Amino acid sequence: MTDILAKIAAYKREDVADRKRRRSIAQLEAAAKAANSPRGFKAALEADHAPGKLALIAEIKKASPSKGLIRADFDPPALARAYAAGGASCLSVLTDGPSFQGADGYLIDVRAAVSLPCIRKDFLVDPWQVAESRALGADAILVILAMIDDAVAADLMSEAARLGMDALVEVHDEAEMERAGKLGSTLVGINNRDLKSFVVDLAVTERLAVQAPSDALLVTESGLFVAADVARMEAAGAKAMLVGESLMRQADVAAATRALLG
């Protein structure tokens, strides 16, 4: 685990312990059951992918550890509507506060503003967070293999399935892709960003895609800025892309989204 992930995992475990003290599992389960039904995150990506076109998971992100503040004019519901107007298939909403200036309320507000499926972009280290994600309205969760062992990953995926949610399993290298296959992952995200140097290289997707489970829908993450990047990733075998920073920095988010999708 890299230093940044170790730091995040440490504060996230403390945060989860505090949240558990304030909210019983019974209360959480009741809230999860009361939430609107999951919208089908993976199904939306499958429906929107076509030859020559990647489905888009558009990310709502105010800041990041590597880039600092990304968008000062930050209105999650308005951004969600702009992404929807631009043709996004799904949305990714950052809810981590310390590293990304996210908030749980952003996910609630975004899901109320649009009809697109939403993934909660956070750092999950405990199955309790999966039920919490469903209670917040999330349709999918992120499982970062660089941060957890296979036992925890399996528990997160099982809990997501129980609650009718999809799990996007994120990998960064060959060893993690092999783990994703053994875990039975059918929605795999390849992060093109090196978590130690923060350098982004689209060749990571090209290298790892050939090792992906044959039945997995591949999502390429980070480093896509122009239509040529999209075409390159589709040629590598990706069926969807997760894009945040390059769109968040645009004045006209809807127009930028349309341009990226071609």
Curated annotation (Swiss-Prot):
This is Indole-3-glycerol phosphate synthase. SUPFAM superfamilies: Ribulose-phoshate binding barrel (SSF51366). The keyword Amino-acid biosynthesis applies. GO terms for biological process: L-tryptophan biosynthetic process. NCBIfam families: PRK00278.1-2, PRK00278.1-6, PRK00278.2-4. It comes from the Bacteria. Its EC number is 4.1.1.48. The keyword Nucleotide-binding does not apply. It holds the Pfam family IGPS. Keywords: Amino-acid biosynthesis, Aromatic amino acid biosynthesis, Decarboxylase, Lyase, Tryptophan biosynthesis. Belongs to the TrpC family. Pathway: Amino-acid biosynthesis; L-tryptophan biosynthesis; L-tryptophan from chorismate: step 4/5. InterPro entries: Aldolase_TIM, Indole-3-glycerol_P_synth, Indole-3-glycerol_P_synth_dom, Indole-3-GlycerolPSynthase_CS, RibuloseP-bd_barrel. It catalyses: 1-(2-carboxyphenylamino)-1-deoxy-D-ribulose 5-phosphate + H(+) = (1S,2R)-1-C-(indol-3-yl)glycerol 3-phosphate + CO2 + H2O. GO terms for molecular function: indole-3-glycerol-phosphate synthase activity; phosphoribosylanthranilate isomerase activity.
